[in-house]
Curated annotation (Swiss-Prot):
<keyword id="KW-0963">Cytoplasm</keyword>
<dbReference type="InterPro" id="IPR025835">
    <property type="entry name" value="Thiopurine_S-MeTrfase"/>
</dbReference>
<feature type="binding site">
    <location>
        <begin position="129"/>
        <end position="130"/>
    </location>
    <ligand>
        <name>S-adenosyl-L-methionine</name>
    </ligand>
</feature>
<keyword id="KW-0949">S-adenosyl-L-methionine</keyword>
<comment type="function">
    <text>Catalyzes the S-methylation of thiopurine drugs such as 6-mercaptopurine (also called mercaptopurine, 6-MP or its brand name Purinethol) using S-adenosyl-L-methionine as the methyl donor. TPMT activity modulates the cytotoxic effects of thiopurine prodrugs. A natural substrate for this enzyme has yet to be identified.</text>
</comment>
<keyword id="KW-0808">Transferase</keyword>
<feature type="binding site">
    <location>
        <position position="64"/>
    </location>
    <ligand>
        <name>S-adenosyl-L-methionine</name>
    </ligand>
</feature>
<dbReference type="GO" id="GO:0005737">
    <property type="term" value="C:cytoplasm"/>
</dbReference>
<comment type="similarity">
    <text>Belongs to the class I-like SAM-binding methyltransferase superfamily. TPMT family.</text>
</comment>
<dbReference type="GO" id="GO:0008119">
    <property type="term" value="F:thiopurine S-methyltransferase activity"/>
</dbReference>
<comment type="subunit">
    <text>Monomer.</text>
</comment>
<feature type="binding site">
    <location>
        <begin position="24"/>
        <end position="35"/>
    </location>
    <ligand>
        <name>S-adenosyl-L-methionine</name>
    </ligand>
</feature>
<dbReference type="Pfam" id="PF05724">
    <property type="entry name" value="TPMT"/>
</dbReference>
<dbReference type="InterPro" id="IPR029063">
    <property type="entry name" value="SAM-dependent_MTases_sf"/>
</dbReference>
<feature type="binding site">
    <location>
        <position position="85"/>
    </location>
    <ligand>
        <name>S-adenosyl-L-methionine</name>
    </ligand>
</feature>
<protein>
    <recommendedName>
        <fullName>Thiopurine S-methyltransferase</fullName>
        <ecNumber>2.1.1.67</ecNumber>
    </recommendedName>
</protein>
<feature type="modified residue" description="Phosphoserine">
    <location>
        <position position="34"/>
    </location>
</feature>
Amino acid sequence: MSLDMKEHPDAEVQKNQVLTLEDWKEKWVTRHISFHQEQGHQLLKKHLDTFLKGQSGLRVFFPLCGKAIEMKWFADRGHTVVGVEISEIGIREFFAEQNLSYTEEPLAEIAGAKVFKSSSGSISLYCCSIFDLPRANIGKFDRIWDRGALVAINPGDHDRYADIILSLLRKEFQYLVAVLSYDPTKHAGPPFYVPSAELKRLFGTKCSMQCLEEVDALEERHKAWGLDYLFEKLYLLTEK
């Protein structure tokens, strides 16, 4: 399949698909977490210099962070990391697997929510829905790394999600987002199909968009979903 055929005409086919927060929590309980990447994200590694621009002391936000090991990468480089994740299991596993001691406390602003902080203070993970997060007043960010977040959000919630992301960006931000391209008539999602036109609709008024790279990401598990092609595209969004 040529890379020119990557925008599927039936992008609307998934628009009514819905997963609840309980569905996502259940994935962690039943270990249906094939979205977790043990070695971290290879495209992020490759484009890390472009993303960080040699700057130090940045605030980096991880939406729907799971137990992404890249959070430790950034903290080890002297950056401050904030993540949000609905599953307490995912958050606890992150600290355990990275051998980081941490504290936990309830969040006064959001009923039932907690914040987990590494003892060094460089990593803070909020256990709540991203749609409740604005109430916690977490400040603004220089960088956002969005892998497995936008593609996991219910398509009907894209606008709400984009509003939150845009509200968290500081001046001169860099927002790096990985999206997937496949035939949405063959797989209901998640991960959901996010065409470039949808990215443009969500972020194009405030952001300039550049596709840094596109790779063939088809694995055996995707073939089992019924897919015969799957591309991952990495976009860098910057201030207009």
